[in-house]
């Protein structure tokens, strides 16, 4: 109704578990099924365009778990979102700061840990942006430095993932 009134252009859903768990888990949701439901209710111009889920170097299921299915092909939630034209925002890029401690996150470039974490997430295919909780102005300034660094290209990113997961 609010879409018909022009008050809401697009909408989405945020979840902590539903897109990270396996199909056998009661909390599991299929993105393909959700998009189909949106089409049944709102037609092809349904407005369901975004999801938000946890993703970082510790919570890597969005990239590595093939727990979704699109056209009967097992894919990750990020692959599913790309195929279904759903934008992905991610949460907890630093795991409430735990990933920023020395030695916690794998080394893969010369960046400081916060920028390394943001670079990994924003270079992941299908991710629009990581959503970062920040309390201090100096953290905002530090995290904005990522804007001066180009994302990792797809081939290099896939090679990095292979290196980090082998």
Residues covered by each model-derived region:
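Beta/alpha (TIM)-barrel catalytic core signal, keyed to glycine-rich beta->alpha loops juxtaposed to Asp/Glu
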Residues: 1-166
């Amino acid at each position: 109704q609010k879409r018909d009134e022009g008050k809401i252009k697009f909408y989405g859903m945020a979840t902590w578990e539903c897109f990270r768990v396996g199909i056998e888990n009661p909390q599991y949701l299929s993105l393909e099924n959700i998009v189909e439901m949106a089409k049944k209710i709102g037609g092809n111009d349904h407005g369901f365009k975004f999801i938000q889920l946890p993703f970082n170097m510790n919570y890597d299921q969005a990239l590595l778990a093939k727990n979704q299915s699109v056209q009967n092909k097992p894919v990750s939630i990020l692959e599913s979102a790309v195929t279904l034209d759903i934008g992905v925002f991610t949460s907890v890029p630093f795991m409430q700061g735990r990933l920023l401690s020395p030695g916690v996150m794998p080394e893969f470039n010369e960046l400081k840990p916060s920028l390394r974490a943001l670079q990994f997430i924003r270079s992941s295919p299908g991710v629009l942006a990581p959503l970062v909780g920040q309390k201090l102005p100096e953290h905002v300034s530090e995290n904005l430095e990522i804007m001066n660094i180009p994302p990792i290209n797809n081939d290099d990113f896939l090679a990095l993932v292979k290196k980090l997961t082998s």
